[in-house]
C-alpha cells in the first residue's frame, strides 16, 4: 500500500514542477514524462522527504531539503552551468546565478517539494506535521493564507502565459482523473507513508545511481568548469551542514478534521483557475515575470535568514 502513496507523491511533484512551469506541459503522460521526469521527481521527493522525517521536521529543514532538490539542475540537467532559458548576464565563477536563485531557492523547494508533500499530507493523512512546519516560514504566521492565495493567483497567471488553453484543460483533467480516486485511500500519519529504514537507504542508493547515469547521458558536453563544479559542491556541503546541525522547535504532529484546510485548499484552486481564465485572454508576461522574481526574492531571503540565524546562534 505504501507504494501507491509514493506513486501519488511522485505524480504531484512531477506535475506541479513541470506542468505549472510549462517546462514539460504533458507532465507524466508521454514517454519522456513517464521514463525520465517521473522517476527523477519521485525519487527526489521520497528520499528527501524520508530523510526530513528521519532527522526531524522543522520549517528550516523543509526548505533546505527543497534546495537540495533544486541542485539536480547542476549535474543532471547542467542548467546551472549552461542554461537554455533566462538571462545570461549574471554569470560568475561558472554559475548562472539568476537560474540558480530561481531553481534552487524558489521553484523546486516550493513546487517540486513543499507543495506536493503538503497536498499529500492533506489528502492522504490525518496529521498536520508539515502544515504546522510550513506555517513557521517568514511572513506565514501573520499572513499565511493571504500569501498562499496570492501564490495560487500568480501560479495561474504564470500558467496562462506558458500554456495554451487546450493543453491546460487536458492537463487539469488528467490531474484530477488520477487524484480524485486517491481521496478514498486510508488516512494515515504522514510519517507512516514516507519511506524509512532500509527502504529509505535503498531509494537513496537508487537516486545516486540516477545522478550518475544522467550526469553522463544528458548534455555531458555542457558540464561546468572546475570553478562551477566547485561552487556546486561547496553549496551542497553548506546545505547538508545546515540540515544536520540546525536546531529549532519541531512542529506538533496531531490529527485534525481538516475542515478549515479543506475549504482553504478549494479556495486556492478556484483562485488559481480564475487567474488562468482571466489572464489567458491577454498578454500577461510582465506579471508572470514579476511572479518569478518575487518568488525568487522571497526564497533567497528565506535561505539568507536561515543562514544568518544559524551563524549568530
Curated annotation (Swiss-Prot):
GO terms for cellular component: plasma membrane. It is a multi-pass membrane protein. The chain crosses the membrane at residues 31-53, 62-84, 104-126, 147-161, 166-185, 198-220, 225-244, 264-282, 286-308. It is found in: Cell membrane. Keywords: Cell membrane, Membrane, Transmembrane, Transmembrane helix. The keyword Cell membrane applies. This is Uncharacterized protein AF_0692. The keyword Transmembrane helix applies. It comes from the Archaea.
Amino acid at each position: 500500500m505504501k507504494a501507491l502513496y509514493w506513486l501519488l507523491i511522485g505524480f504531484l511533484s512531477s506535475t506541479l514542477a513541470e506542468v505549472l512551469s510549462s517546462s514539460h506541459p504533458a507532465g507524466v503522460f508521454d514517454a519522456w514524462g513517464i521514463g525520465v521526469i517521473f522517476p527523477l521527481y519521485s525519487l527526489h521527493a521520497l528520499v528527501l522527504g524520508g530523510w526530513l522525517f528521519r532527522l526531524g521536521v522543522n520549517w528550516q529543514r523543509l526548505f533546505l531539503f527543497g534546495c537540495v532538490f533544486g541542485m539536480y539542475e547542476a549535474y543532471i540537467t547542467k542548467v546551472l552551468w549552461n542554461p537554455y532559458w533566462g538571462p545570461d548576464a549574471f554569470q560568475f565563477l561558472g554559475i548562472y546565478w539568476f537560474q540558480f536563485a530561481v531553481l534552487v531557492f524558489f521553484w523546486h523547494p516550493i513546487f517540486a517539494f513543499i507543495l506536493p508533500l503538503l497536498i499529500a499530507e492533506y489528502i492522504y493523512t490525518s496529521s498536520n506535521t508539515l502544515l504546522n512546519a510550513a506555517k513557521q516560514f517568514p511572513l506565514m504566521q501573520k499572513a499565511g493564507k493571504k500569501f498562499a492565495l496570492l501564490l495560487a493567483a500568480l501560479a495561474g497567471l504564470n500558467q496562462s502565459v506558458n500554456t495554451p488553453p487546450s493543453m491546460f484543460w487536458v492537463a487539469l483533467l488528467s490531474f484530477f482523473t488520477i487524484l480524485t480516486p486517491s481521496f478514498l485511500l486510508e488516512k494515515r500519519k504522514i510519517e507512516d507513508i514516507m519511506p524509512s529504514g532500509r527502504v529509505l537507504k535503498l531509494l537513496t542508493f537508487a537516486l545516486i545511481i540516477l545522478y550518475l547515469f544522467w550526469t553522463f547521458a544528458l548534455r555531458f558536453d555542457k558540464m561546468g568548469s572546475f570553478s562551477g563544479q566547485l561552487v556546486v559542491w561547496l553549496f551542497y556541503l553548506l546545505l547538508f551542514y545546515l540540515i544536520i546541525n540546525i536546531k529549532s522547535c519541531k512542529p506538533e504532529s496531531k490529527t485534525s478534521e481538516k475542515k478549515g484546510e479543506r475549504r482553504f485548499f478549494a479556495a486556492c484552486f478556484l483562485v488559481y483557475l480564475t487567474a488562468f481564465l482571466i489572464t489567458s485572454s491577454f498578454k500577461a508576461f510582465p506579471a508572470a515575470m514579476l511572479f518569478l522574481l518575487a518568488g525568487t526574492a522571497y526564497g533567497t531571503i528565506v535561505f539568507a535568514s536561515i543562514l544568518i540565524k544559524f551563524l549568530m546562534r
